[in-house]
Amino acid sequence: MANLYTKTGDKGQTSLVGGSRISKSDPQVECYGTIDEANSMLGLAYSHTGQEYIRNTIHAIQGRLFSLAAELASDAEGISGLKGLIGEEDVSFLENVVDTCTETTGKMTHFVIPGVDPASSALHVARTIVRRAERRM
């Protein structure tokens, strides 16, 4: 993995996968940064639960978020070299997760106040971060 610093004086610019440079304030950077933030919060939720299904599901979602962030952090040249682009099978996977959770917990009929335990609280924060990422796309 490359260093976290470049020592080149970025002047507010960052490189995309593929080599082009854009402003760090560009909406594209904000979008993939928000996905990274959601992924980190899922990691926190993962660390707070011992339930195998939840841990496996979080891990699978994290892998997909890494792929999504890579796509969002790429220019046209860079995206052509990526493996495992997000596709319909990923959407189906997430829909199945939602269906399984709904079967387990029942259909939501009212808003839930977060804070039951650390894992569920972290999942609620991750949910709101993902909603923000949606608005950024």
Predicted features along the sequence, with ranges:
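Phosphate/pyrophosphate-binding loop motifs in nucleotide- or prenyl diphosphate-using proteins
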Residues: 1-137
